[in-house]
Structure formats: C-alpha cells, structure tokens
Design a protein with these regions (language model features):
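Conserved short histidine dyad/triad with adjacent acidic residue
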Residues: 23-29, 36-56, 137-141, 151-168, ...
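Glycine- and acidic-residue-biased ligand/ion/polar-headgroup-sensing regions
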Residues: 58-74, 169-186
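Ligand-binding loop in jelly-roll beta-barrel domains
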Residues: 91-115, 202-223
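A short, N-terminal "cap"/entry segment at the start of jelly-roll beta-barrel domains
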Residues: 1-39, 82-83, 102-104, 109-149
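Conserved small-residue-rich
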Residues: 119-180, 186-187
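A cytosolic small-molecule/anion-sensing beta-strand core signal
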Residues: 65-66, 82, 101, 177-178, ...
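Short acidic-glycine-tyrosine-enriched beta hairpin
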Residues: 75-92, 186-203
Length: 223
C-alpha cells in the first residue's frame, strides 16, 4: 500500500479538510489521485509556481479549497479563483494554472461526452453553493455533471431536513459549502461545517441531518 492509499484509508468515515491536509511544499507543485483512476486529483501549488498551459481533449472542473489560483490560456484568457470558487476549463485549447500566494484545489476530469447541467459554462467562475436555493422544509438537489466514472451533485437542506441512512455505490467526498449538519457514518455521528470534507467508502452506511441550513456538494465515484 502506498502513502496515498494510506491517507485515503485514514480519512474514511472522518471529517477532514482537503485544504489543510494537503499543504503546499515550498517551490513545488504536488498532485495526489483520489479513488484510483477516476480522474479526481488533489493539487497543492506553492506560491509562485505554475502548471504549464497544455491542450487537453477534456474539461477540468476545479474546486478551490485554499488560497487562489489563476487559470490562463491563449488570447488573454485569464480567470482567478479563490477558496470556494470553481471553474470548468475549456477543451482543445492551451490551459494552465499559476498562483502567487499558493493554492490547494480538487481537479475533476470531465470528458466531453459527460452529461453537464446547462447552467455550467466553460471558462466561467462560479460557486457550487450558488447553484441551488434553499426551499422551506425541502431538500433541493441538482446534478452538475455525470459520466461513467463519477457524478457531482449539489444539495441544499433546509434546517431539520436530511437523508435517511443509505450506502454509496462507490467512494465519495462531501464538500460542505454552507451551514452545518450531522453526518452519521457506520453508527457514528460527526458534525460537519462549511469548508470541511467527509470521505465515504464504497458501501459505507451514512445519513445526513441538517442541524442548520446546509449545502453540500457530493462527488461520487462510480464502478
């Protein structure tokens, strides 16, 4: 078992922080895959580092956890993302990343044939938490992107609502976006707050109970 696998096992069933658990190494760019070959990677970029612009035949969805990162390309294309912001990069044109202060972000590979919600436009900065509204006494759900290897969903829970115990068909990460909730996992309750993450193992029984208004993104790997 390599160190990466060991870290994934440590975070299973626990509240953790992608940003705090992957601090940048001075002068370096570091990448760490999640869930094997599902196209989900945690990146840590030290200040004044960059990933050279290259052409990719697929989109990249970035979810920034810490710091800020500039996504840049040809013809003056440039978008700066801060913690809590996301972008879907364009395809078939050079795209690179650079940072002056350092950044930690999650990158999700999104194939062209993936089913994407029409609200998402390539090259535009957005916040996942802004995609869905709260509804009184309701749980509001939006599929953001879906392909054979992963699915990203954003959910808004009114205070007191939740999801009863169920199991995920693959490994999954929760991104807490707003508010607070209690995650029940294999009989243990844990509080999760905005800015934190939670790691479900495949088949792990879990539930969600919003103790306050709560928004989260669920990134699910599929077998």
């Amino acid at each position: 078992m390599n160190d990466m696998d060991g870290h994934e096992e440590k975070t299973v069933g626990e509240v953790f922080s992608i940003g705090k658990d992957n601090p940048p190494i001075p002068g370096c760019t570091v990448s760490k895959a999640f869930g094997g070959d599902k196209g989900i990677i945690f990146f840590s970029l030290a200040k004044h580092t960059d990933i050279s612009a290259e052409i990719y035949p697929y989109h990249k969805l970035l979810i920034v956890a810490e710091g800020s990162v500039e996504v840049y390309g040809k013809d003056g294309f440039s978008q700066v993302l801060h913690a809590g912001e996301s972008i879907l990069t364009p395809t078939d044109v050079p795209v690179g990343m650079q940072t002056t202060e350092g950044s930690v972000y999650t990158e999700v590979r999104v194939e062209k044939e993936s089913r994407m919600n029409e609200i998402i436009k390539a090259g535009e900065v957005f916040k996942l938490e802004d995609l869905v509204p709260y509804g009184e006494g309701k749980v509001v759900n939006m599929d953001v992107v879906h392909n054979d290897k992963m699915k990203l969903v954003v959910m808004a829970f009114d205070e007191g609502t939740g999801l009863s115990e169920h199991a995920a068909p693959g490994e999954a990460i929760i991104f807490a976006l707003d508010g607070e909730a209690v995650i029940g996992y294999e009989g243990k309750d844990q509080v999760i707050r905005a800015g934190e993450n939670f790691h479900f193992a495949k088949g792990g029984l879990h539930s969600v109970k919003a103790t306050k208004k709560f928004k989260m993104a669920l990134l699910l790997t599929l077998e």
